[in-house]
């Protein structure tokens, strides 16, 4: 069977509700605007339908990102084997204590959302916790690297919102990753649209445990139109 290494099952109701190629910032903004249009029943039906569609497509294992408990009932009775990554994010969030109830579900572990949306202390705490793989959004847009250079759309967005970042001194997302995550921790790096050879060298030179590059081509084309430089991998 096939493996879907990166899924947001609980967001299945948003399929087709957000314009294509609006870029990462546009996608995030549109998501916050449209999500309240859907009832709890519509959301639940979309989760059921997505699970069934994946099984029909030959998918037998899924790495699913979760921010809440709305999809666990479907996953518990599905024929698909799910591994759930409970996602921590928020520049004003100091700990993951509010997510701990979700970790009671089977095959569920904590992961940071990305290297640009989590402050240093919680990132290091999550990276040091347990031995399950981490699933991290990585270099999805040019703005991620630009943020560490105090420029670009993420930098402007954060400045306008009054967010401060205590991690920009690392110099780049890749350098932050290897400084904060132990070398023997397995990682799934998701999207990878804007990785460079230097990023790859930094990452692969650090980790002794497996690193999986999860490319999400359909998602990348839909959100930004960007394609990972697969020739480097």
Give the ranges of each region predicted by the language model.
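Structural preference for beta-strand elements that scaffold enzyme active sites
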Residues: 3, 28-29, 60-61, 81-83, ...
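Active-site gating/metal-coordination segments in enzymes
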Residues: 48, 52, 60, 99-133
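Active-site-adjacent C-terminal substructures of enzyme catalytic domains
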Residues: 113-124, 163-233
